[in-house]
């Protein structure tokens, strides 16, 4: 499902706050080999990701409701030391028994309120020695490699990944009848993806599986639709230039009509057109470099355009196919494009 949806990596909740490990842990007997399905779910997850060419991330909760030192660690130093040794032993298992791992995704550094209390600097250095290429998120009370705004896409001036859940109300399983009114549509997922791509971030979209491990039906349809859209338009999403390279001159996230992503060499711009202009004509302003070609990304068809003396690109004959959700127009330049801020040159004219 993740591959079909166009995702490039997955993060598995290897152990959540209730302390249940989804692998054959020798440190924590409360695990999926001893209880429940009697399977090493982490192993199956890793094998499936490698088969499909997906990056591998491990979520690891710092808070643990089950461990006897999980609360005492905040005020008893001996309990703190025992608890930290326990957490590190768990993560050491994960980072030594399953080959190359790409992401360590900490969560909920409670009840201790400082990285010193968690001994995060030294522990993370030891874990990096096991996986030299791993990246670590910012939830061990250190900034580490990337930020993780949650529940709302908040742009950060660093590498970041928005952490969203599929229906906005539950991170675990919610029966389909209750979840359906809140389920994301393909359009809403694409809107989130656009906001992230426009602003140099990734989108991590949580889906709570059903009790049998399958994906709920209310998630399958929109994710499949997004995947099909990305098959044709993924060039506007994957590996695009971080907006900070333009030193703040580029508006972030679009203006309600369109959102922008652009190529690494600044020789192309991808215009995500949320609102189709009546009559099929739209003006894109503030561009001080003359384009050489405009195409519709999903079909490759050439779009008629005209570059005006007042630094506007007039796009003609724009149209939306049934079920297309949002068309993307690729504007190409012979040299890196120059753009002036929107407060001087209004950007989109319908």
Regions found by a protein language model. Give the residues of each.
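Mature catalytic domains of secreted/periplasmic carbohydrate-active enzymes
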Residues: 1-350
């Amino acid at each position: 499902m993740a591959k079909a949806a166009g995702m490039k990596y997955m993060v598995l909740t290897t152990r959540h706050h209730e302390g249940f490990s989804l692998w054959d842990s020798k440190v924590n007997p409360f695990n999926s080999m001893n209880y429940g399905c009697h399977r090493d779910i982490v192993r199956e997850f890793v094998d499936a990701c490698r088969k499909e060419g997906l990056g591998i991330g491990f979520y690891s909760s710092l808070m643990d409701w089950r461990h006897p030192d999980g609360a005492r660690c905040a005020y008893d130093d001996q309990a703190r030391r025992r608890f930290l040794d326990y957490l590190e032993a768990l993560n050491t298992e994960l980072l030594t028994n399953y080959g190359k791992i790409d992401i360590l995704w900490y969560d909920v550094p409670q009840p201790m309120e400082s990285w010193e209390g968690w001994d995060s600097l030294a522990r993370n250095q030891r874990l990096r020695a096991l996986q030299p290429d791993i990246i670590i998120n910012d939830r061990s009370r250190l900034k580490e490699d990337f930020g993780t705004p949650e529940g709302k896409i908040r742009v950060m001036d660093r590498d970041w990944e928005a952490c969203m859940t599929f229906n906005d109300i539950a991170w675990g399983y919610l029966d389909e009848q209750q979840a359906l009114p809140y389920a994301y549509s393909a359009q809403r997922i694409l809107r989130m993806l656009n906001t992230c791509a426009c602003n140099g971030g990734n989108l991590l979209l949580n889906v709570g599986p059903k009790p049998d491990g399958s994906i709920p039906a209310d998630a399958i349809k929109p994710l499949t639709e997004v995947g099909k859209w990305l098959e044709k338009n993924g060039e506007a999403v994957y590996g695009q230039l971080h907006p900070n390279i333009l030193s703040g001159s580029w508006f972030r996230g679009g203006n309600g009509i369109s959102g922008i992503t652009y190529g690494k060499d600044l020789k192309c711009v991808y215009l995500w057109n949320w609102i189709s202009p009546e009559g099929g004509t739209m003006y894109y302003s503030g561009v001080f470099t003359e384009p050489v070609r405009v195409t519709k990304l999903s079909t490759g068809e050439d779009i008629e355009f005209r570059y005006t003396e007042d630094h506007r690109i007039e796009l003609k004959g724009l149209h939306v196919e049934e079920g297309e959700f949002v068309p993307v127009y690729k504007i190409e330049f012979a040299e890196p494009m120059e753009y002036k801020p929107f407060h001087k040159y209004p950007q989109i004219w319908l």
